[in-house]
């Protein structure tokens, strides 16, 4: 006993271009199950033809895409975005200087590995402004940009400028210049290092699990995480690095101090390292409380809108 022919439905969505779909035969006419249209029957034709519609695209279902999808071959990879990213990474690795003499090989998952030999680097002792990249992490431009962004969103009392140098005379000279700027709070001193000690693997895993929350915060896990590693306090030493921590009650004073530090950094790029940090609590002395309130009253308390129009 013959059964009825299975209806073949075109799994298309949306508008189509000139496309043929299989339909069922009924009363000498084709009934198009895809588009709910009845078209004249043609004995020689096996399919019904759908008129072309301009500015339309074919949306194939996921099942058809899986059946007709080609494998991700090297030819496809050659023109893909992933290939461009991989090329950029290889070029970056080939031009980046990480060591004095290094030979690195970058391997590809598509059998396209080539050895990359990085050029030798000379150990520079005399640095100048030309050696430092203008947009690098330690550049004065990047430092001022970070100070500017912090002062846009935070009050000056929670922003701190940090200066580090091994040249004590240079730090003293910068400290004297900073004292010529009004309303500054400057901490100066030499860094002290406690006794060095290698942690065990158990200690590293315990603190990592505690901070990530992968273990319950019980008394035992809290004790393992918070218990300090005791060393001999007499085995301390001075690192030879002098630091300046600069704070100010107003944005005006702190920004002037930042520009002064940048001037010293441009003049002595190999001797000064600048940094900026955001504090958790404001640092404001009682001597600066009236200055702080007066300065902020001009901005927040008075009619600031009228002052902007003038």
Curated annotation (Swiss-Prot):
InterPro entries: Herpes_IE2_3. GO terms for biological process: regulation of DNA-templated transcription. Belongs to the herpesviridae U84 family. This is Protein U84. It comes from Human herpesvirus 7 (strain JI) (HHV-7). The lineage of its organism: Viruses, Duplodnaviria, Heunggongvirae, Peploviricota, Herviviricetes.
């Amino acid at each position: 006993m013959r059964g009825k022919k299975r209806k073949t439905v075109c799994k298309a969505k949306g508008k189509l271009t000139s496309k043929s779909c299989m339909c069922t035969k009924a009363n000498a006419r084709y009934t198009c199950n895809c588009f709910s249209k009845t078209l004249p029957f043609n004995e020689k034709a096996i399919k019904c033809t759908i008129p072309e519609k301009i500015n339309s695209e074919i949306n194939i279902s996921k099942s058809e895409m899986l059946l007709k999808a080609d494998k991700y071959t090297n030819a496809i990879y050659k023109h893909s975005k992933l290939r461009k990213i991989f090329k950029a990474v290889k070029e970056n690795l080939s031009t980046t200087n990480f060591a004095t003499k290094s030979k690195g090989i970058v391997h590809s998952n598509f059998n396209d590995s080539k050895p990359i030999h990085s050029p030798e680097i000379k150990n520079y002792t005399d640095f100048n402004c030309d050696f430092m990249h203008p947009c690098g992490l330690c550049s004065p431009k990047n430092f001022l940009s970070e100070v500017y962004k912090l002062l846009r969103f935070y009050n000056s009392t929670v922003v701190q400028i940090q200066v580090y140098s091994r040249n004590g005379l240079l730090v003293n000279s910068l400290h004297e210049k900073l004292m010529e700027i009004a309303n500054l709070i400057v901490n100066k001193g030499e860094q002290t290092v406690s006794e060095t000690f290698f942690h065990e693997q158990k200690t590293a895993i315990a603190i990592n699990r505690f901070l990530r929350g992968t273990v319950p915060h019980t008394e035992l896990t809290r004790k393992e995480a918070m218990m300090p590693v005791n060393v001999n306090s007499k085995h301390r030493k001075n690192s030879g690095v002098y630091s300046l921590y600069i704070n100010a009650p107003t944005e005006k004073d702190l920004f002037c101090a930042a520009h002064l530090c940048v001037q010293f950094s441009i003049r002595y790029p190999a001797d000064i390292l600048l940094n900026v940090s955001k504090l958790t609590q404001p640092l404001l002395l009682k001597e600066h409380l009236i200055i702080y309130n007066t300065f902020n009253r001009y901005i927040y308390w008075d009619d600031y809108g009228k002052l902007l129009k003038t």
